[in-house]
């Protein structure tokens, strides 16, 4: 019988930052990247510190692996039209913040951007997309390759290995038909359940650690409240309270304030900051 498990976004916020639970993230990454990944630490920055004022629909975490690569996980629940731009900004910020001013450019670390989205982002029939950087000749259409000195310098064989690597998992586009271990993980991300036949790395640990029935009473109440807030926000996006111009969102916030809606809920629903909403009073 399939157990009801905790949503992955909540798990990242509350559970998977603990070292004893790294095995779950390591399993997911190993299946996605098709290589053995070991996480050595979770890094804190202004973007991923615990903050109750943050938008409910976005969760992120920054990790560092045994190869000193940076891995940023981001889970986006509701629609965001400029999401691709935010992915680019996030990766650029990690690179600039983590490189010492006196460091050589060759010391720039590899960054993996893992994006789990629960909305229909762009046109495409697949549910897992990978983005890399390569250079092709405008006249000969040949692919630029590293020479032997560069391979030794970077310790990479291909140019694309130097640049950030992007993954987008469109969870809601998955048809629940599992064909490999990565599909088993996506099934879990979509349904919060693990089938007895699944064998993907990290899923058995996820089944054990993320069992809803094993949550303490206070923790369960907070989790249920989180789910309620997500459902409320989703309903707001589906209605006229969705993404719009800043003037429209300000007007919506004013109306919600008049009707006694809590400021944090207004912030989550409109994308406005707490300070912007307080200024409307």
Tell where the protein language model's regions lie, with residue ranges.
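Short, charged alpha-helical interaction segments and adjacent helix-coil junctions
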Residues: 2, 66, 71-76, 173, ...
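Short, hydrophobic/amphipathic alpha-helical patches that form generic packing surfaces
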Residues: 10-14, 168-171, 184-188
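Accessory alpha/beta interaction modules
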Residues: 1-165, 175
């Amino acid at each position: 019988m399939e157990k009801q498990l905790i949503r992955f976004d909540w798990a990242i916020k509350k559970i998977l930052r603990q070292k004893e639970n790294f095995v779950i993230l390591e399993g997911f990454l190993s299946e996605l990247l098709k290589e053995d990944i070991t996480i050595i630490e979770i890094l804190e920055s202004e973007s991923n510190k615990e903050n109750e004022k943050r938008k409910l629909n976005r969760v992120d975490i920054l990790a560092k692996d045994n190869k000193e690569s940076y891995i940023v996980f981001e889970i986006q629940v509701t629609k965001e039209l400029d999401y691709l731009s935010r992915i680019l900004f996030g990766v650029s910020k990690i690179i600039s913040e983590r490189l010492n001013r006196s460091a050589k450019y060759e010391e720039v670390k590899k960054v993996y951007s893992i994006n789990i989205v629960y909305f229909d982002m762009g046109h495409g029939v697949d549910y897992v997309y990978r983005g890399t950087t390569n250079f092709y000749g405008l006249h000969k259409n040949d692919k630029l390759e590293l020479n032997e000195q560069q391979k030794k310098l970077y310790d990479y064989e291909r140019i694309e290995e130097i640049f950030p690597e992007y993954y987008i998992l469109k969870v809601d586009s998955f048809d629940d038909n599992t064909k490999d271990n990565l599909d088993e993980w996506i099934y879990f991300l979509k349904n919060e359940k693990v089938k007895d036949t699944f064998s993907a790395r990290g899923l058995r640990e996820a089944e054990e650690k993320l069992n809803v029935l094993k949550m303490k009473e206070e923790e369960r109440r907070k989790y249920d409240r989180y789910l309620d807030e997500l459902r409320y926000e989703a309903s707001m996006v589906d209605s006229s309270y969705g993404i719009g111009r800043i003037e429209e969102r300000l007007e919506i916030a004013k109306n919600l304030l008049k009707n006694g809606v809590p400021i944090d809920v207004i912030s989550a629903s409109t994308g406005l900051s707490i300070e912007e909403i307080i200024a409307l009073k």
